[in-house]
C-alpha cells in the first residue's frame, strides 16, 4: 500500500508552473508550444516569446508567427504531406512563399521608434523564423537527394520493394507499445533473408543513418523508437524460418539434447507451439507472446511467468547469431550449458566468433568466461540494470550492440 500523502504541496507546486500554452495551430501532437518553438527556433526564441507575451497590443504578429510555425510543424509530423510536397515542387514553392509572406507582414508591423528594446527582440525572432523557413525548404532537397542515394546503395543488398519511404511504412514504425513518438524514420527496410542483414547494415553505415532493429514492436522501453530523422528501421518480421524440435549435439555434452532453431522474426508463440508438439515447454513466455518476436526476446532477455521455473532467454539459449555495428557477423555459442538457470553454474563460458560480411571468412575468435552469479542480483533475480552483462554481446542490450538474426534454444 502506498504511504498517504497530502495534495496541498503538489497542487501548490503545479500552480506555480507556467501554463502549457497551445497557440500554435494545426498541432495535433502532444508537443507543447514551448517544445515546438525550441525544436524549430531554439531555446533563446522561447525566452524572447515569453518576454513579449505580456506586451502584445493586437497579437496579430504573434498569430502570424505561430501560423508559420504551425505550417512547418504539421508537415514535419505528417509523412503523407511530406511525400506530397516532395512530389510537387510547385506546391512546395507556394507554401514557402506563403511562409515568407507572413514574416514580411510581421516586418511591416515593427515600430522601432516606439520601443527600441522590444523591436530588437521582434527582430531577433524574425531572424530565427527566416532561418527556420529556409531550413524547412532546404530539407526537402536534402531528403530527395538522400532517398536517391539510399535507393542506389541499398538495392545492392535487398529487393527494391524492401526499401520503403512511403508514409504508411514510416508511420507504422515511428513508435512501439509505449506510443511515444519523437521522429519518423527516414526509411524502413524489410529484408527477405538473414543473409541480407550484414550488407544492409554496412550500407546504412555508409549513408550515415542511425540503425534501429525492430521485431514485433511490442516493447515498453522505447528501444525501437527513432530519435533522429536520419534513421533506418530494419524490420526483421520476414525472418520467420524455424525448425521443429530437433535433437542435436551441443558443446560440453556427450548426449544430444532437444533444441529448436529460429530466425529473429519468428513470433514467440510459434516456438512455444513447436515445443508443445514435441512434448516440451519453451521457457520464454512474455505477455506479448502472440505478437513479440524472438530477436526482441533475446535483445530484452525476456522472461515471463514460466521463467520462475525455467529461467529467462539467457538461461535457455544455446547459441545466437547477430550483425555487429561494424557490419560483421558474430556467432555466440554457450560451451558448457548446464541445461538449467545460468546462475546455478559456477562459470558460464561462451565462444565468440567474428566473420566478415560474407559470413564465411572468420576474422577472430574469443572465449568469455563469466561467473554464473554475475547474471543475477541477490534478492532480485534478473538484474535489468546490468546491460553490460560482463561483455556478453546481444543479450539484454535492447539492440544497442547489434542486430539479432537467429538463435538456437
Predicted regions and their residues:
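Residue-level detector of anion-binding/catalytic polar loops
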Residues: 209-210, 281
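FAD-binding subdomain of flavoenzyme oxidoreductases
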Residues: 241-251, 261-409
